[in-house]
Amino acid sequence: MTRYIFITGGVVSSLGKGLASAALGALLQARGYSVRLRKLDPYLNVDPGTMSPIQHGEVYVTDDGAETDLDLGHYERFTGVPASRADNITTGRIYQEIIQRERRGDYLGGTVQVIPHVTDAIKEFVLSGNLDVDFVLCEIGGTVGDIEGLPFFEAIRQLGNELDRGQTCYIHLTLLPFIPSAGEMKTKPTQHSVKELRSIGIQPDILMCRCDRPIPKDERRKIALFCNVRETAVIQAMDVDTIYDVPNAYHLEGLDDEVLSVFGIKGSKEPNLAKWQTIAHNIREPEGDVTIAIVGKYTGLKDAYKSLSEALVHGGIANKVRVNVKWVESEVFDTEDTAFYLEDVDGILVPGGFGERGSEGKIRAAQFARTRNVPYFGICFGMQMAVIEALRNVGGLEGASSTEFGPTNEPVVGLMTEWMRENELVKRAAHGDLGGTMRLGAYDAMLAEGSRVAQIYGSTVISERHRHRYEVNMTYREQIEAAGLLMSGVSPDGLLPEIIEIPDHPWYIGVQYHPELKSKPFEPHPLFRSFVEAAVEQSRLV
């Protein structure tokens, strides 16, 4: 029997529901159970693909090409279970599907309403494809009381009645603020949040209380009394040094035991958390430090590069060093010297992005890394800027540019209008919609024998996740390689460049895909492991 755990939030957003869900999934896995994690987002966008990274954070891409919420990245990193298109849904997508059904006449002339049509669609999403899974964890985005979230709360309330007794568990994440002037922790926001949840028919089984200090016994007892839960169900969710210590911390608080108790499961084996303890130890007690500059255009919100930041942490774990990230807004190089920002770093990473703003700064960062022999990692847009830089400054092609920035006589980077996916030709109109029209998901690449990337991967055939609509123009291949960049990875049909590298540089690699999306703390991505290793070597030269 599949059991369902619904994770909701109250008081304020950004309390860490995604991390709590991922950590609980990891704890249940460590006890021998199979898990599946899903995210229900109440916003009206069909997916986050066209949303600003500064508003929404990163867009996490799955193997099957879905553009999803960044929380799915936490789910994958903590559990190792690959997410898919079926693990994230939005109000926009539900409404889109319902309206399409209505236009087809599927409702036979009936009035289409939020209840039952929208709530039924949400329930159908939650219950689908779970036959072989012990636990399904569903996180509801936003906070209780948000008007756009009401259909989701109503749907999970109905599921509590429709599923068998003991088949559902409701976990509510709240904030326990400490008021310095009063010298005490306040429980009233939590009480009101639970009151709001109960007013729509949901009684939480477990409360996870986010706090920055231990919860006094009296406050814990008070929360249990006024929120109608057992004292043992008031879980202290304190801040920790690293997110990879969260599974250990929640286990010590008894979260997994309490969840199993809600389901009436007895005699479950103790979780094996050895790998999490090792990871947390390596992060807390590194053998050294390196500094990596991330030269990006969305540095105002670090969540825009969430998977990237975590992949660097994973590379640090593999090399037993702490990776200190120096965030550099690429536009500063339009007016300031790159050396002022980059001369003290051990590696430079230029991540993906869209649009002309900040592009010249990224080109200058690539030039600095190439000429100063500093390890350079260009991802997606970062690879494209590295190619443009080399052709301008080494290849003598001063007009080298991208058609993304406007008309150019030297379209070194251009819009893709067709590509192959699973032996089928995919076409995109040059002036079509932006949403869902990129080259998305996992694609194979063939690596050159003897190349650095082939040595790093230990293979000449790889599969990586993509998210881009512009690509380095293959007609410039001879000029690119004459400028010193080896095209060491291409698509299986040989038509799309995937990887460039400089063979005689300490470490200079650009990739068209997003390797950060497949990195995990217990399985660091080979490129990030190698890049941080190169940064360690660079730090020893200073």
Swiss-Prot record:
Pathway: Pyrimidine metabolism; CTP biosynthesis via de novo pathway; CTP from UDP: step 2/2. Keywords: ATP-binding, Glutamine amidotransferase, Ligase, Magnesium, Metal-binding, Nucleotide-binding, Pyrimidine biosynthesis. It holds the Pfam family GATase. InterPro entries: Class_I_gatase-like, CTP_synthase, CTP_synthase_N, GATASE, GATase1_CTP_Synthase, P-loop_NTPase. Gene3D superfamilies: 3.40.50.880, P-loop containing nucleotide triphosphate hydrolases (3.40.50.300). It comes from the Bacteria. Homotetramer. It is an enzyme of class 6 (ligase). Residues 1-265 are annotated as: Amidoligase domain. ATP binds at residues 14-19, 71. Residues 291-541 form the Glutamine amidotransferase type-1 domain. Mg(2+) binds at residues 71, 139. CTP binds at residues 13, 146-148, 186-191, 222. L-glutamine binds at residues 353, 381-384, 404, 469. This is CTP synthase. One of its GO terms (cellular component) is cytosol. Its EC number is 6.3.4.2. UTP binds at residues 13, 186-191, 222. Allosterically activated by GTP, when glutamine is the substrate; GTP has no effect on the reaction when ammonia is the substrate. The allosteric effector GTP functions by stabilizing the protein conformation that binds the tetrahedral intermediate(s) formed during glutamine hydrolysis. Inhibited by the product CTP, via allosteric rather than competitive inhibition. Catalyzes the ATP-dependent amination of UTP to CTP with either L-glutamine or ammonia as the source of nitrogen. Regulates intracellular CTP levels through interactions with the four ribonucleotide triphosphates. The gene is pyrG. CTPSs have evolved a hybrid strategy for distinguishing between UTP and CTP. The overlapping regions of the product feedback inhibitory and substrate sites recognize a common feature in both compounds, the triphosphate moiety. To differentiate isosteric substrate and product pyrimidine rings, an additional pocket far from the expected kinase/ligase catalytic site, specifically recognizes the cytosine and ribose portions of the product inhibitor. The active site is at residues 380, 514, 516. One of its GO terms (molecular function) is glutaminase activity. Belongs to the CTP synthase family. One of its GO terms (biological process) is 'de novo' CTP biosynthetic process.
